[in-house]
A protein has these predicted regions:
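Alpha-helical lid/collar subdomain of P-loop NTPases
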Residues: 196-359
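Terminal-proximal interaction/regulatory segments of ATP-powered molecular machines
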Residues: 300-512
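Generic hydrophobic, helix-prone segments enriched in Leu/Val/Ile
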Residues: 10, 100-104, 242, 436-443
Length: 512
């Protein structure tokens, strides 16, 4: 099973386990809600899909790496309590609440969400003293004498023994009480995530050329060398920041993330070439419709990996513009909705209240900011959604300052001022949309002149289809040449599939 399918299964499980019947009781009794056990190599994204699943299901998440805990923190600390049993006063041992269970209740209070996912990582790597506690947790959904609160779905994760020497095998009694999912690395599935997460285009381009270097764990006499999906993503974030700061990422830095000597060396060399191609070919000039004639001459003798790198650079530039357009559009839509609410609020104000509109606007802003903080704390905002809300709040602060500067007293006067401010934001949205559309047309002009209907054009159109930002932009704004090339590509695929079916049919008849 790949990581995408595992995420879907977790989301479906959360919805099923939290579904209620007509009486308000959980449709599946807690005793029949089997914990999910994810088994897969390290760095594949098990923890990350838990965050995504919780956010998309609108529930809370408490995540623990159990190897960081002792038996006392998992079960609770013992203390003596006096009891009266059968006419006798006796001293009995009881336990404080488990730190993990306490964290669940604390999360419920902090977020206001009463249902969620309790995720325990590295569950099969615990110490000998904690192993019985983990078995009890999976079998009975308790830590010590404290049960996991109702409405919380249990998900655990572990590594197969070939990746971790500390692994302890579960017995059949435990395995018969869980839903086990075995996860394997899958580059194509990871690339779908990487496109949506805006991972660095050099990494995606490199892995297109060297898919075998996506995920490796090799043990030799010098120790274990490895590269994981987590390593590529963390490196991507650093590369983006280094570029923004004007810093150079060398091989020594890359080795800190890609802890496989040959792959780190290979990617470092590719990254240097990638930046060189960006400068030599003038990618920004191409997207501005000003490609130099020398570029076409150079491409005639360029090797395939160089041509593919250039296509990747063009796609990266386009996706940056598509993302900017989408974010400008989202911010404008949110500000427009806020403006409509403000108009309704202004209608309730008497005209003679000093700073009435500005004061009301400030209160609405405060409520908006509080809602953002709450959703952020609850983990319900994606990176893009958070960026949009922060952008909107910054715009609203500017609008409030204009209201106070203009000393608008009348509600109509205040609304007219805000409407003027919104027009500037709307103009920014239109400019971002126009910049993206113009760059897309320039890119197609270049691709047609440089590559015509070659394999590079197939890659270009395919990536536009698969990249969420590109697909959304083209769907909303259109692009005749994209639709034509995409149609031709689909026809070619169908024709090839039909030819394969006919060939298979002929082989079957030939063998009779």
């Amino acid at each position: 099973m790949n990581i995408k399918r595992a995420k879907e299964e977790i989301e479906h499980t959360v919805k099923a386990y939290l579904a209620k019947d007509a009486l308000g009781e959980y449709a599946i009794p807690a005793i029949r809600q089997r914990p999910i056990l994810l088994m897969g190599p390290p760095g594949i994204g098990k923890t990350q899909i838990m965050e995504q699943a919780a956010r998309e299901c609108g529930v809370a998440l408490v995540a623990y790496t159990i190897t960081h805990h002792t038996r006392q923190s998992a079960v609770g600390l013992p203390f003596i309590r006096q009891r009266h049993y059968d006419g006798k006063d006796v001293s009995v041992t009881e336990y404080t609440m488990s730190e993990i269970i306490a964290s669940v209740y604390a999360r419920m209070e902090a977020t206001g969400l009463k249902e969620g996912i309790l995720f325990i990582d590295e569950i099969n790597c615990v110490s000998e003293t904690l192993a019985p506690t983990m078995l009890q947790f999976l079998q009975c959904k308790t830590f010590g004498n404290q049960a996991v609160p109702a409405g919380w779905v249990i998900v655990a994760a572990g590594n197969p023994p070939e990746y971790n020497k500390s692994v302890r095998d579960f017995d059949i009694v435990t395995l018969d009480r869980v839903r086990r999912m075995d996860i394997e690395p899958d580059l194509q599935v990871w690339k779908d995530y990487a496109r949506a997460a805006h991972l660095h285009s050099a990494i995606l381009s490199y892995l297109d050329l060297h898919p075998q270097n996506f995920y490796q764990i090799n043990a030799d006499v010098d120790g274990t060398q490895f590269v994981t999906a987590r390593g590529w993503e963390d490196l991507s974030n650093l590369l983006d920041t280094y570029e923004a700061l004007g810093l150079k990422a060398d091989e020594a830095l890359i080795r800190q993330y890609i802890q496989h000597e040959k792959i780190a060396e290979d990617f470092s060399a590719y990254l240097d070439l990638y930046y060189k191609y960006r400068d030599d070919y003038g990618v920004e000039e191409i997207l501005a419709g000003q490609a130099k004639p020398a570029v076409f001459a150079r491409l005639l003798n360029a090797p395939f990996d160089e041509r593919l790198s250039l296509v990747s650079l063009l796609l990266s530039g386009l996706n940056n513009r598509f993302t900017a357009s989408r974010r400008a559009d989202a911010a404008a839509d949110a500000c427009y909705a806020f403006l409509r609410e403000a108009k309704l609020g202004f209608a309730t104000l008497p005209d003679d209240i000093p700073d009435g509109p500005a004061t009301l606007f400030n209160q609405m802003m405060t409520d908006y900011d509080a809602e953002t903080r709450h959703q952020r704390e609850a983990g319900l905002l994606s990176r893009d959604a958070l960026a949009t809300r922060l952008k909107v709040y910054a715009v609203l602060r500017q609008w409030e300052a204009e209201l106070r500067r203009a000393k608008a007293v009348g509600t109509q006067e205040a609304f007219d001022l805000l409407r003027t401010q919104f027009q500037s934001l709307s103009d920014e949205r239109d400019a971002a949309q126009e910049a993206a559309a113009s760059a897309l047309e320039a890119a197609f002009d270049f691709m047609e002149q440089a590559f015509a209907e070659s394999q590079e054009m197939v890659v270009f159109v395919t990536e536009l289809t698969l990249a969420p930002a590109a697909h959304a932009f083209i769907t909303e704004n259109g692009c005749p040449r994209y639709f034509q090339y995409n149609k031709d590509l689909l026809l070619d695929h169908r024709k090839a599939a039909l030819q394969q079916e006919l060939a298979a049919e002929e082989r079957r008849h030939g063998g009779m």
